[in-house]
Amino acid sequence: MKLRNLFLLIALSLPVCLSAQTSKQIYLQRADSLLQQILTLYKVEKYGLLTETYPRKPEQRITYTANTGVVVNQQEVSFLWPYSALVSGCVSLYKVSGQKKYRKLMDRQIKPGLDLYWDSTRIPHCYQSYPAFAGHNDRYYDDNDWVAIDFCDYYERTGDKEYLEKAIQLHDYIYSGWSEELGGGIYWCEQKKESKNTCSNAPATVLCMKLFKLTKDAKYLEQAKKTYQWTRDNLCDPSDFVYWDNKNLQGKVDPAKYTYNSGQMIQAGVLLYQATGEKRYLKEAQQTAEGSCRFFLKVQPIAIGEMKFFPGTSWFNVILFRGLKALYLVDRNEAYIKTMIENVDYAWNYTRDENGLFSNDWSGHREEQFKSLLENACMIELFAEISELQFKHNKQ
C-alpha cells in the first residue's frame, strides 16, 4: 500500500475526538481560507467583481440575453448565480462567527458588487442574470429567491433594515411571476415563461417563511402554505418523495431530479412545521430527506475501498444541506447530515488542486481544468454552516 493510502486509511477509519470548539474552528478556518482564495484568484479589478471560472475560460460568452438568447459579448465577469453563492458564504460566516470583518466585507465589497446586477429600468425592479452595464439580460425568479433569502438571514443577524426592505422588494418581484396557469406556481424565468419549476417555488416558500418570522405578517405564512402545496401537488414524485424539476405549460413534467430542489422543500417543510405545529410538514420533510439520500447517494471507489457520495453538483448539494441541517436541528437524526459532512471532509483532504480549489466531484474521480466560482463559493457556506454542528466526533 502506498504511503498516501495508508494515511488515508488512518484518517477515515479512526474517529477524531475533538472538542466542539476545536471542530468549529477547523470548519471556520476552511471557510475563511477558501473565501480569501476566491477573492484573490477570481478578482476582476476593473469592476470589483469575480470571474466565472479560475483560470478564466477564454471562450466564455454571455448567453443569458433578455430577448433572443444569442451570444452577444465576451463574458468579463460571472453571472449573478455564482456571485450570489459568495453572498451566501459571507452571510453564513458572519452569522456563525459574528466577526466584524465579514460584515465589513459584505457591506463594503460584496453588496456593492451585487448592486451592479440590479436592474432599475424594468418594473418590478430586481437583480438580472448579468451586470446592468452590459445591457438587459434575463431575469430569473430563482436567482432572486437565493439573494432574498440571504438578505433575510443577514438582516436577522445585523438588524440593518436595508436588507429586510430589499428582501421584501425581491419577494414582490418573485411573486409577480405567479400565475394561475397549471393552477398556480411561479415561473422560472421572466423572459421565458414556459415552465413552473421547483427551483423557483420551493425557495419562494422558504423566503415567505423567513419574512413571516421577521415581520409577523400572516400574509407571508399563507403564501408559503399555498406555494408549498402547489409544489408538492405538482412536482413531488409520490414513489420516493423526491422532487422533479419542472412542469411545462402543456402539463408535462420534466422528471429530472436535482438535490437542491428536494433540499428546499425539506427546509420549507421544517419551517412550516415550526411555525404551525402541523406534524404533516415535518413528516413530509423527513420523507423527502430519506428519499433524497436513497436516490442521490452512490457508492464510489476510493483508495481504501468504497464510500457513498452525493452527485457532482456541489452548489445543489449545499442547498440540500440547508434542508438537512434544518431537519436535523428539529429531529436530531444525524444520519443524512453526517454523510454530507464526510463527503466534504474527504473532498477537502484529498481532492483540492494546487490552489486549494474544488472540482464538482467530491470523490475526486473527475478533475476540471477550469474551477467554477459557483462550485467553490458555495463551499464557504457549507463549511461555515457545518461549524455550528456538534457531534461526538467528526472525521476531519
Where are these regions (language model features)?
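CBM-like carbohydrate-recognition segments
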Residues: 23-84, 96, 101, 112-142, ...
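The canonical alpha-helical register within tetratricopeptide repeats
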Residues: 37, 108, 112, 169-173, ...
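Well-ordered alpha-helical scaffold segments within catalytic/enzyme domains
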Residues: 84-100, 146-160, 203-217, 264-278, ...
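Extended ligand-binding groove/face enriched in aromatic
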Residues: 100-211, 218-225
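Surface-exposed cleft-lining segments at the edges of enzyme active sites
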Residues: 188-193, 215, 247-255, 276
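Active-site cradle of extracellular carbohydrate-active enzymes
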Residues: 198-204, 208-212, 220-269
